[in-house]
Amino acid sequence: MSQSISLKGSTRTVTEFFEYSINSILYQRGVYPAEDFVTVKKYDLTLLKTHDDELKDYIRKILLQVHRWLLGGKCNQLVLCIVDKDEGEVVERWSFNVQHISGNSNGQDDVVDLNTTQSQIRALIRQITSSVTFLPELTKEGGYTFTVLAYTDADAKVPLEWADSNSKEIPDGEVVQFKTFSTNDHKVGAQVSYKY
């Protein structure tokens, strides 16, 4: 018998995916030094996760709020921008689109089991990890930082720590679309745009 995921479980799955994706991108792109990361097992993969307390807390605060918005159906996109510290210019824009699926339990064909979801997440994380093979090298060691944008509904409650921002698009950037994954309540797609 397959295990399906509830709304809370689906939201937790999506939020957890964001956590591992952010960590993976920050490591793979050299935004933080390799020694700030440790290996962990997740999704039957060996992944990297920061052990830097300040960075962990920052990511945790972001994802706690994103989790609340997802649970309420208020967040439809999460964006991680890698920014050149000197120029203030966005050099990569990692976009995760979230589609909220409602009323999906009317037939057995619509149920997404946990194993399928995890397999799709594995494929997506592998694509993110392998992106270093085609993305331009970020050459300024220690010269990059990141920011996270959340696209929410107009009526979403926004904490004071969050501020409105422009979309931080990369004009005339190259765009690479990645795979998607689905739960019973969410469909998540990813893409990266970058300066070439």
Curated annotation (Swiss-Prot):
Organism annotation: Saccharomyces cerevisiae (strain ATCC 204508 / S288c)
Family: Belongs to the MAD2 family.
Domain of life from the UniProt record: Eukaryota
Protein name listed in UniProt: Mitotic spindle checkpoint component MAD2
Keyword terms, alphabetized: Cell cycle, Cell division, Mitosis, Nucleus
Compartments (UniProt record): Nucleus
GO CC annotation terms, alphabetical: cytoplasm; kinetochore; mitotic checkpoint complex; mitotic checkpoint complex, CDC20-MAD2 subcomplex; nucleoplasm
Chain coiled-coil ranges: none
UniProt cross-references to InterPro entries, sorted A to Z: HORMA_dom, HORMA_dom_sf, Mad2-like
Pfam families assigned: HORMA
GO biological process: cell division; mitotic DNA integrity checkpoint signaling; mitotic spindle assembly checkpoint signaling; positive regulation of protein autoubiquitination
Function: Central component of the spindle assembly checkpoint which is a feedback control that prevents cells with incompletely assembled spindles from leaving mitosis. Thought to be recruited to unattached kinetochores by MAD1. During checkpoint activity, MAD2 is relayed from the MAD1-MAD2 complex to the mitotic checkpoint complex (MCC). MCC and presumably the MAD2-CDC20 subcomplex inhibit the ubiquitin ligase activity of the anaphase promoting complex/cyclosome (APC/C) by preventing its activation by CDC20.
